[in-house]
């Protein structure tokens, strides 16, 4: 069995697209079509980070974006927005990116947590994602079959530069994107660690695939939330708040 199961899907047109939201009177179906959107958006998944950014960065809420997510413009970087309040995972990330791209957003960057497969990546040290192993489902509906979804190279370079300018160590490499947190098996962890994959996340492959399909730029930055090895799981979620805030600053610099 392959995904998608319908042959030649990638050559077919979709019935529903983000642009059609203007035709709906339902508030939750009204998609973005605003000339006032920022050109770049940081996607956030942890509520504490989103709340901190909104409170501390003198952010201005952008109304009229429907009910799927919240969007703010940063007071100190008005060309950059932050999206949040939409949960986690590949499907919702794809929908948010679709709607923002339809509204004119040209660049995206994830600022989030990820499990780490390599102990040499220290807590608080940003990981610049170069590509994502497509172990979720969404990416397969956007681009042709393949093992990887790739970050935009220009975004990767901007992220690396932003990390260096923040005087932080740079870790550059692939992530493993999965939608099944409780099925991250020991053989998979061993194999992907041996391949040099740095992290495991839930969104990057979907974002990269949507970006390729919609011809926009996308990157991803991660900070370590836990370590996964064949013999143990080492959770560090309680130590990520400050690291996420630093990572957000790096993402904003990369998008500015």
What residue ranges belong to the model's regions?
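Generic non-transmembrane alpha-helical segments
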Residues: 158-166, 210, 250-254
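Zn-dependent metallopeptidase/amidohydrolase metal-coordination segment
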Residues: 205-239
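His/Asp/Glu-rich mid-to-C-terminal helical/loop segments that flank catalytic regions of hydrolases
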Residues: 228-256
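Active-site rim beta-loop-alpha module in soluble metabolic enzymes
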Residues: 146-195
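Short acidic/polar active-site loop segments enriched in Thr and Asp
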Residues: 106-107, 198, 217
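Non-catalytic positions within long, well-ordered alpha-helices that form the structural scaffold/packing
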Residues: 100-102, 193, 212
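Metabolite-binding pocket within alpha/beta catalytic cores that recognizes anionic/polar moieties
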Residues: 1-158
């Amino acid at each position: 069995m392959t995904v998608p199961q319908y042959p030649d899907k990638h050559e077919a047109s979709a019935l529903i697209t983000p642009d059609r939201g203007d035709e709906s009177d339902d508030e939750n179906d009204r998609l973005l079509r605003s000339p006032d959107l920022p050109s770049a958006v940081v996607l956030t998944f942890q509520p504490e980070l989103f709340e901190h950014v909104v409170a501390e960065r003198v952010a201005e809420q952008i109304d009229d974006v429907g009910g799927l997510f919240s969007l703010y413009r940063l007071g100190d970087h008005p060309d950059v927005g932050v999206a949040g309040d939409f949960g986690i995972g590949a499907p919702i990330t794809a929908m948010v990116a679709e709607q923002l791209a339809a509204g004119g957003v040209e660049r995206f960057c994830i600022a989030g947590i990820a499990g780490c497969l390599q102990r040499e990546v220290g807590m608080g040290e940003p990981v610049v994602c170069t590509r994502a192993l497509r172990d979720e489902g969404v990416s397969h509906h956007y681009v042709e079959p393949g093992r990887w979804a790739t970050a935009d190279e220009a975004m990767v370079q901007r992220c690396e530069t932003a990390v260096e300018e923040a005087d932080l160590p740079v870790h550059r490499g692939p992530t493993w994107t999965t939608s099944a947190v409780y099925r991250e098996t020991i053989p998979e962890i061993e194999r992907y660690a041996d391949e040099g994959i740095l992290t495991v996340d839930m969104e990057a492959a979907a974002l990269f695939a949507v970006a390729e399909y919609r011809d926009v730029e996308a990157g991803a930055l991660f900070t370590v939330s836990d370590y996964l090895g064949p013999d143990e799981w080492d959770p560090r979620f309680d130590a990520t708040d400050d690291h996420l805030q630093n990572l957000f600053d790096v993402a904003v610099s990369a998008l500015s």
